[in-house]
Amino acid sequence: MIDKQKQNLNMKVQWAKFAVVLALYLLFLIWVESWLGLIVVPFIFDVYITKKIHWQWWKDEEGPVRFIMSWVDALVFALVAVYFINLFFFQNYVIPSSSLEKSLLTGDYLFVSKVSYGPRIPETPLTMPLTQHTLPLVNVKSYVEWPHWDYRRVKGLGNVKLNDIVVFNYPAGDTLCNEERYQANDFYLMCYSIGDQILEQNGQQQDIRVLNPLQQRRYFEKVYAAGRNYIASMPGEYGDIISRPTDRRENYVKRCVGLPGQTLQIKNRIVYLDGKANKEPDNVQYTYKMKLKGEFPIELADELGITNEDLLMYNQSGVIPLTKKAYLALKANKNLVESISINTDARYGDLYPLNAYTGWTCDNYGPVWIPKKGKSIQLNLKNLPIYERCIKVYEGNDLKVDSQGNIFINGKLAKSYTFKLDYYWMMGDNRHNSADSRYWGFVPEDHIVGKPIFIWWSHSPDHPGFSGIRWNRLFNFVDNIK
């Protein structure tokens, strides 16, 4: 009698567990709008109620089988849980470079929310958890490209807002050399740079400033082809030329300084949107030419937030990235600083678009209209280089220009184009030391990964061990970093 009561009580508990799990699972399916997941419901029912499938058969075994399978079971469960959580809710991201300093620092570990902008349904769902694109040590792909699902984003808490710090997939990372030392390089920039050198050596280099738009297009096609063919002919040096799907490209983090439909222009380092100046981040950095009377004191560097990387740049080139606060402090230090001034010769070459001459610099750029979903733009040979990548690569159209300069999209003469996606303009706060939209263009909406919420760990690469922990940054909310 007692055993029967216990059995009945146990079944009630199992039914309660099943009801809770089923309700949560159905809510999840409603959220992601995927009723295909209903095929899992019978298995959930079996786990809690019918128990027809002996899910944990290994518990009946003796010896090493039971021990090994218990660890395998725990490991598989952990990997599946991590995969699911990283895909739909949040993931960890570490700041690898100084492009957002001094807002986010090298060595900051971020809690990145997928729910803020809505998680993407994965394009390549079959991937090894905790990897982005490559298995460590063996240097092979950590994912398979079948099945490949089209872009779709689940409803989130909101949209990307102006001046948000955003994690996204690197737009120019669709094609790369798989030799490890070149994987982080911009493949398109490599092709144009190498091609330019080849044409110069062959006496075929031209002054692009005097060419009309159609002549420029043909010339840059020749430059790109020369560079790509050279890279393809040197697999021992560069490896194979490979492609990566959107969700397997490197993760970048920058600040969104331009939204879909806005016209962006940079004038004397200030970003203007639709003619109005956008507020600079509090800790924005520019590089300064500086001449010292002696050695730079380490204590002063720590006080002003100047890193070893910053000092190395100064020792190599005579320029140093500084916030306004650091600049004013050094300018006032007459005993140390002989002269200091803004670097007006900051990096200017190799700007987007790579296949046209614009005369723009990283401090004076544009204007460019940022594409907005459903909006159209009149196409001509002058603005085509700016929007060609959006039309061809990100939105999957066939685009050609004939010998007369006529533009054809999917075989039809095109005078205009209507965009299918929203696009964003991303820049680092370290304005003279950031590879961003000025160099590789727009960020499509399907590349948006998530929003950093807070810094859960921070360790300075300049100070090893316990002394490098930045206690004052732990659990700081990223939205408070303006």
Task: Give each language-model segment a name.
Residues 1-482:
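Extended hydrophobic leader/signal-anchor segments used for secretion and membrane insertion
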